[in-house]
């Protein structure tokens, strides 16, 4: 295509084409030597929900290094961002419905003209109808079979979610922020915007993938932050909040419902590991709660298998 032709004209362009043909894992193993650097690059790339074994995505590693985008946090918390977006929609004449479950997409003369809710209400539009739901919900559940080409239905049925996408979350209310032991020599660590714990070597990536493939819980590698260090408005005066996330399989031990019995103990395990690095957490945790990939799917059904995308 035109892009390929343009890239072929320069050495850097040809280099990009060559890198793109590899998987992120191959790129890191072939271009970097230090085990910790390899592990870190793969971990950060994995946070972007790219399957690190997938050929055709090798360029995602140099794109990660060259990109100007940094981790960000919304002042007031994620709810403040949601409230700002909804306020803007309403200001421009839009309407938002919550707890309204769609039953079908209404079709007329070969085009979508509205949706019908499970309570029987119909909402129509003279403009266009857009779906932000997953492929199975949109093309197999909400649209009738005669409204979707068979090839599209087959593609939707065959869509596979990212093996490493599901997240497990530990959230804590604190009397004070974590104080890391390593900060005695490197005080800036207590002001880190993001902390990664448990990541030591490249082989851990393979162990995590294998654990996900077999529905097992791998040795913990987690990342998180203490948002109130940067935005005190997210907690009562003098108090703090913190969180850690870990990529864990949806169907743990073969069945996602197993998370109901395992969730709290795994959260305690994460907190113990966190306290190994920040010992004051043994004394300052006021309360905590956990959230598994199954919990995500239960509250947000469009995130099938807990896939956040």
Predicted features and spans:
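Helical element adjacent to the flavin cofactor pocket in flavoenzyme catalytic cores
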Residues: 29, 61-121, 126-127
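Rossmann-like flavin
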Residues: 1-54
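Flavin-binding catalytic cores
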Residues: 177-178, 205, 209-219, 260-295
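Mid-domain catalytic core of redox enzymes
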Residues: 73, 103-235
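Surface-exposed helix-capping loop/turn segments at secondary-structure junctions
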Residues: 35, 90-96, 108, 180, ...
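A glycine-rich dinucleotide-binding beta-alpha-beta segment and adjacent secondary-structure elements
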Residues: 34-49, 217-225, 279-309
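Short glycine/threonine-rich loop-to-helix capping motif typified by GTGT followed
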Residues: 107-112, 144, 257-259, 291-306
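Conserved FAD/dinucleotide-binding core of flavoprotein oxidoreductases
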Residues: 136-141, 173-175, 196, 208, ...
């Amino acid at each position: 295509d035109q892009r390929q032709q343009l890239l072929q004209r320069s050495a850097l362009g040809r280099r990009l084409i060559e890198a793109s043909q590899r998987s992120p894992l191959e790129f890191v193993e072939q271009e970097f030597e230090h085990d910790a650097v390899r592990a870190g690059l793969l971990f950060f790339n994995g946070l972007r929900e790219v399957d690190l074994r997938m050929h055709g995505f090798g360029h995602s590693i140099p794109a990660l290094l060259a990109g100007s985008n940094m981790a960000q946090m919304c002042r007031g918390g994620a709810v403040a961002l949601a409230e700002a977006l909804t306020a803007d929609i309403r200001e421009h004449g839009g309407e938002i419905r919550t707890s309204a479950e769609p039953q079908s997409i209404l079709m007329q003369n070969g085009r979508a003209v509205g949706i019908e809710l499970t309570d029987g209400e119909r909402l129509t539009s003279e403009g266009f109808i857009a779906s932000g739901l997953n492929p199975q919900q949109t093309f197999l559940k909400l649209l009738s079979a005669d409204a979707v080409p068979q090839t599209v239905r087959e593609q939707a049925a065959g869509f596979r979610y990212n093996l490493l996408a599901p997240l497990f979350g530990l959230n804590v209310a604190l009397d004070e922020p974590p104080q890391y032991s390593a900060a005695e020599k490197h005080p800036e660590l207590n002001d880190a915007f993001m902390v990664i714990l448990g990541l030591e070597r490249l082989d851990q990536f393979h162990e995590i993938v294998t654990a996900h493939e077999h529905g097992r819980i791998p040795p913990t590698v987690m990342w998180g932050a203490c948002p109130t260090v940067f935005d005190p408005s997210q907690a009562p005066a003098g108090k703090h909040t913190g969180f850690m996330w870990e990529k864990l399989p949806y169907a743990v031990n073969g069945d996602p419902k197993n998370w109901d019995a395992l969730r709290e103990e795994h959260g305690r395990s994460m907190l113990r590991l966190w306290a190994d690095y920040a010992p004051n957490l043994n004394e300052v945790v006021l309360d905590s709660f956990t959230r598994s990939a199954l919990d995500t799917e239960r509250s947000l059904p469009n995130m099938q298998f807990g896939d956040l995308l």
